[in-house]
Amino acid sequence: MKKILANRIQQHIKRIIHHDKVGFIPGMQGFFIIRKSINVINHISKLKNKNHMTISRDAEKAFDKTQHSFMIKILQKVDIAGTYLNIIKTIYDKPTANIVLNGEKLKAFPLRSGTRQGCPLSPLLFNIVLEVLATATREEKEINGIQIRKEEVKLSLFADDMILYIENPKDVTREVLELINEFGKVAGYEINAQKSLAFLYTNDGKSEREIKETLPFTTATKRIKYLGIYLPRKTKDLYAENYKTLIKAVKDDTNR
């Protein structure tokens, strides 16, 4: 039943989800946003005046914290209705869980958040919920993305893995955090600032130090791991950061 529901919603998911997001979307692949991130980093490195930042945001148990009531409201907002919506409501109507301690099942307790593990619907429902934050980020004029020709690039997303590309990080970071906090109050979404990593691009060390003082994120000096790929601060290091380490690992395995 849930697989049938997932197949049905996938027929309409591109109407709901922006092309910035690729995870669990028909015809979209993870390497699309890897290539996009590399292009953005390469573009920034060629700019004469640098005042930019890329942030890889680490969400805290994002699937587990999704609020059911908010999820249902968002499904209604994107015109999911009728029998389909009623079935999803039934799936998430007063779910409970038990803890088994020393072989004994303890009293059931209610679950008010979290998409169901292993359910083919879960990543699709999560995508729809997170699109609210993604849309708000795109539409927020105080958050400046990276201007590449006629397009302003702000986001890349794969499920809960998100990269944000911004200009004027000293002024914009507060707006980004406020937006996430407001979304988190209703959706249950939180980021782990200490595990989130950022590349800073400035023209001088003084500016970089001033920006670092305002950031709750860790600033990376060489690379950020995203979807299993090491994105280097400078694109010329792509080969060394990825292929050389992979070749060494293969050689070590074959020589054992």
For every predicted segment, state its role.
Residues 1-256:
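Nucleotidyl polymerases of mobile genetic elements and RNA viruses
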